[in-house]
Curated annotation (Swiss-Prot):
Enzyme class: transferase
NCBIfam families recorded: polynuc_phos, PRK11824.1
A GO BP entry: mRNA catabolic process
Residue ranges of domain S1 motif in the record: 623-691
Binding site for Mg(2+): 487, 493
Biological role stated in the UniProt entry: Involved in mRNA degradation. Catalyzes the phosphorolysis of single-stranded polyribonucleotides processively in the 3'- to 5'-direction.
Compartmental location: Cytoplasm
Domain KH, chain residue ranges per copy: 554-613
Organism: Geobacillus kaustophilus (strain HTA426)
GO terms for MF: 3'-5'-RNA exonuclease activity; magnesium ion binding; polyribonucleotide nucleotidyltransferase activity; RNA binding
InterPro entries found in the cross-reference section: ExoRNase_PH_dom1, ExoRNase_PH_dom2, ExoRNase_PH_dom2_sf, KH_dom, KH_dom_type_1, KH_dom_type_1_sf, NA-bd_OB-fold, PNPase
UniProt-recorded name of the protein: Polyribonucleotide nucleotidyltransferase
């Protein structure tokens, strides 16, 4: 049946949100064009007709940026978009997290959700349009999606919450919180905050959820008019008789195995049980499909037992209490030649973070859809396979590494000093050396220690902790500092980072359909208790940032010049500034207001570069005496360089008190002579007199005023001095 174009509209934060269906991408299972202000995003949802032979739900979410959306042509030689930007990967994950839990257990059809950003209005966030568009595309399609969901951004300006803040409002906001959910519950939260108390965070989440509910009602109206009938699918379920047989065979052994406290030993014990059961069925010559079911049933039994222990017996696999943190240890200064390093260990999770300081010219240049063009604070996260005792390829960062790195960056950025306070580019790299859950939060703790070790004057130390949840019917248990098995088999991974004062970042992923206010509140307060305990431990390792930077870190010298002189310092095609850099070995960054940052490991090189720049911008003053160098001789006089690039003419009549027949009788090229500035004419030409210097010296009955040479300050007396 031919689809007709339909247009639906609702007001969101004072701006129209328009959904168009039935005109574009009609071969997808579902498609929606979202217009929010001048932001335009096309979201599509497509599914395979047959289930895939896999043991997981194959969902892919892609957020595609197009630089034409902001009137840009991509840089480089290729001139087209390549791999997704970091922002695109983060938004893809942002959309994935709230929609993934809303597909039925056992659904194995491949689903792909694509949001293509076609036009960007900076006051109307494209990620919000993409999140809503993805939900609409799934909801009106024939894909069995148990939504809809919706999401909004919540800011806080002057103590008041704001939905989808504009760029101007965001600059004043101490909170950037993305909340998504169904009409009944919240199922995704992601935030960056400037040390905001937990109570305020909770109210912001609930404030955002009220708008979410309104947007869901809007989507339900759309689905009622243009929604397709859902396709019939067969959900994967293992053979009940086989499950009963394996339960009888392995349940007791699994109960013992999951309570082995140490991770590697527990994993080995569970694998031994599984291997024994699989070997039995292999001996019976079971086919591949049956063996696959055996493995899935065994996994289900392990999951059930872990969850039963936690919710019923309040026992965790490693024997801890539900609110107990694993043993902590930390150290700083572990790498001798780096600018700062911190090692943080929590149980069998261990992260080494390294802080590197650079000049402002080392900032990361961004070429994306946002207004931001550069970034001076970076946190990168690496997760090598040896951290979990496995082999594997060492490739570039994947989506998970980029997501964890960004979360750590968001958590630490509020405490990083401003460019004026600390004019350095800061790069943190977190190397995961051991992993048993909560590595992203361990990287925040290790990075805090690394910055303090490097002497970065952070406003306050930051720690992070991951909270878990196991929910069975109406009973639930919240876990502090979850380990790998609790994350894998539980219902929630709620990461909370902050200072003693408040939250700086949080991220919530869940596997169930949503959480209530009560669960969120309990998780936030339990996380605060754990965070303060970790901060107490970190302060025992290093209580405050070091007063001195590492001797291997660059030293930065700041100077100010008249902005009108910037072009003189740079020179034609950068010739002058490159000459200074080549001569001194420093890095130089110049801002439009005339502030110059000179950086080098060698303080003497900084001072040398500063002197050269001062000479370049120095103004010649009438009446002043300078020590100059004869650069050129003509019949009518000598041209004398006073300092870098500044010269003047000593007429032959001004070379000496008596009559001078030839210029060469008094001076030669290369001589250094004292001259007085007598005039700067309308054309900027400088007239000099050596005779005036001699006369002044004779009038006061003294010798030639040699102290005037100090005005030059830096040129050695390599040539003879003429009286």
């Amino acid at each position: 049946m031919e689809q007709e174009k339909r247009v639906f509209s609702i007001d969101v934060a004072g701006r129209p949100l328009i959904i168009e269906t039935g005109e574009l991408a009609k071969q997808a299972n579902g498609a929606a064009l979202v217009r929010y202000g001048d932001t335009v995003v096309l979201s599509t949802a497509t599914a395979s007709r047959e289930a895939k032979n896999v043991d997981f739900f194959p969902l892919t979410v892609n957020y595609e940026e197009r630089l034409y959306a902001v009137g840009k042509i991509p840089g480089g030689f290729i001139k087209r978009e390549g791999r997704p930007s970091e922002k695109a990967i983060l938004v893809s994950r942002l959309i994935d997290r709230p929609i993934r839990p809303l597909f039925a257990e056992g659904f194995r059809n491949e689903v792909q959700v694509v949001s293509m950003v076609m036009s960007v209005d900076q006051d109307c966030a494209p990620e919000v349009a993409a999140l809503i568009g993805s939900s609409v595309a799934l909801t009106i399609s024939d894909i069995p999606f148990e939504g809809p969901i919706a999401g909004v951004i919540v800011g806080r300006v002057d103590g008041q919450f704001v939905i989808n803040p504009t760029v101007e409002q965001m600059e004043k906001s101490d909170l950037h919180l993305v909340v998504a959910g169904t009409k009944d519950a919240i199922n995704m939260v992601e935030a960056g905050a400037d040390e905001v108390p937990e109570e305020v965070i909770l109210e912001a989440i609930m404030f955002g959820h009220e708008e979410v509910k309104r947007l869901i009602a809007f989507q339900e109206e759309i689905a009622a008019q243009v929604g397709k009938e859902k396709m019939e699918v067969v959900l994967y379920e293992p053979d009940p008789a086989l499950e009963a047989e394996i339960r009888q065979l392995a349940e007791a052994d699994i109960k013992r195995a999951v309570q082995v406290p140490e991770k590697l030993a527990r994993d080995a014990a569970i694998e031994d049980v599984k291997a024994g059961v699989i070997a039995k069925y292999e001996a019976e010559e079971a086919d591949e499909e049956k063996l696959k079911q055996v493995q899935e049933i065994l996994h289900k039994l392990v999951k059930e037992e872990v969850r039963r222990l936690i919710t019923v017996e309040k026992i965790r696999p490693d024997g801890r209490k539900v609110d107990e943190i694993r043993p902590l240890s930390s150290a700083v200064g572990v790498l001798p030649r780096t600018h700062g390093s911190g090692l943080f260990t929590r149980g069998q999770t261990q992260v080494l973070s390294v802080c590197t300081l650079g000049a402002l010219g080392d900032v990361q240049i961004l070429d994306g859809l946002d207004l931001e063009e550069s970034k001076r604070f970076m946190h990168h996260y690496n997760f090598p396979p040896f951290s979990v005792g496995e082999t594997g390829p060492m490739r570039g960062p994947g989506r998970r590494e980029i997501g964890h790195g960004a979360l750590g960056e968001r958590a630490l950025e509020p405490v990083v000093p401003s460019e004026r306070e600390f004019p350095y580019t800061i790069r943190l790299v977190s190397e995961v050396l051991e992993s048993n859950g909560s590595t992203s939060q361990a990287s925040i703790c290790a990075s805090t220690l690394a910055m303090m070790d490097a002497g970065v004057p952070i406003k306050a130390p930051v720690a992070g902790i991951a909270m878990g949840l196991v929910k069975n019917d109406d009973h639930y248990t919240i876990l502090t500092d979850i380990q790998g098995i609790e994350d894998h088999l539980g219902d929630m991974d709620f990461k909370v980072a902050g200072t003693r004062k408040g939250v700086t970042a949080l991220q919530m992923d869940i596997k169930i359909k949503g959480l209530t206010r009560e669960i969120l509140e309990e998780a936030l307060m339990q996380a605060r208790k754990g965070r303060l305990e970790i901060l107490d431990h970190m302060m025992q390792t290093l209580s405050e940032p070091r007063k001195e930077l590492s001797k291997y870190a660059p030293k930065i010298l700041i100077m100010h010049i008249n902005p009108d002189k910037i072009r003189e310092v740079i020179g034609p095609s950068g010739k002058q500034i490159n000459k200074i850099i080549d001569e001194t070995g420093v890095k130089i960054d110049i801002e439009q207001d005339g502030t110059i940052f000179i950086s080098s490991v060698d303080e003497a090189a900084n001072q040398k570069a500063k002197q050269i720049i001062e000479d370049i911008v120095r103004e010649v003053e009438v009446g002043q005496v300078y020590l100059g160098k004869v650069k050129r001789i003509e019949k009518f006089g000598a041209f004398v360089e006073l300092f870098n690039g500044k010269d003047g003419l000593v007429h032959i009549s001004e070379l000496a008190e008596g009559r001078v027949g030839k210029v060469e009788d008094v001076v030669s090229i290369g001589d250094e002579i004292l001259v007085k500035v007598t005039e700067i004419d309308k054309q900027g030409r400088v007239n000099l007199s050596r005779k005036a210097v001699l006369r002044d010296a004779r009038n006061i009955g003294g010798e030639l005023p040699r102290e005037s040479r100090e005005k030059r300050g830096r040129r050695p007396e390599r040539h003879r001095m003429k009286p």
